[in-house]
Regions:
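Conserved active-site-adjacent core of cysteine acyl-enzyme catalytic domains
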Residues: 44-179
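Active-site-adjacent structural segments surrounding the nucleophilic cysteine of cysteine proteases
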Residues: 1-70, 186, 212
Length: 225
């Protein structure tokens, strides 16, 4: 099971019009920043450090990973995540678009179940008219999708067969050691158990110290209060 990732949208008003371009084009974070936005979601989730789509796009430009009149070079993800100490690589170079039963989809599913995140390049279909990166994760026995360009149900809970048919490449992100950390929400039962344990330790400490000068002063304070 994955830790639920931070959700970022490339078309967020805070940065959608910020430049994500090289000489000879006029693209923005909103129009071409899906890849860096996926990376930003992973990086902030794993490290806890604020790293926005704008930050990721700036890093991509500075390090030469913005593709002229396209989006982001496939080679971007590995060094971007490595800059934060996160292991990442492309699953392989086999294009799986139009191949819903290809073994790479099963390999991707197995990685998700082990605690990896996946970044998938989608081709023409429900997610894009050309090419689009999405972040994929696993929770409660289901594949989940963080689409950096949409929160529509059809895009974040898309049909698994359609997804496999339209996914072209995968990049894996090793988040196992982070996802194994305790990050569940506090429940009443957990609180009660923690309180019970703490009170037991406190009472034992009182019994261990119920003699000598400390105990005498404590009793005097209690009487005078």
């Amino acid at each position: 099971m994955n830790k639920k990732p931070v959700s970022y949208l490339q078309n967020d008003p805070r940065w959608k019009d910020k430049p994500y371009r090289v000489k000879g084009e006029s693209s923005t974070v909103g129009s071409a920043g899906c890849g860096p936005t996926c990376a930003a979601m992973v990086i902030q989730t794993i490290t806890g450090k604020t790293f926005t789509p704008e930050d990721a796009c700036n890093w991509s430009i500075q390090h030469g990973y913005k593709a002229l009149k396209q989006g982001t070079y496939y080679s971007y993800f590995k060094p971007q995540l490595a800059a934060f100490g996160i292991d990442c690589d492309q699953l392989d170079w086999t294009a799986t678009y139009g191949k819903p039963n290809h073994q790479n989809h099963q390999r991707a599913l197995e990685l998700l179940k082990q605690g990896y995140y996946l970044i998938a390049l989608m081709n023409k279909g429900a997610w894009t008219s050309s090419g689009h990166f999405v972040l994929v994760w696993w929770a409660d026995g289901k594949i989940r999708i963080n689409d950096p360009a949409s929160t529509k149900d059809a895009r974040v809970n898309g049909d698994p067969y359609d997804f496999r048919s339209q996914a072209k490449y995968y990049w894996w992100v090793d988040a196992r050691k982070y996802n194994n950390e305790e990050d569940d929400d506090m429940t009443q039962d957990k609180f009660n158990e923690m309180f019970k344990t703490a009170m037991g330790a406190y009472r034992q400490e009182l019994r261990d110290n119920d003699s000598g000068e400390w105990s005498k002063k404590a009793r005097e304070y209690a009487v005078s209060s």
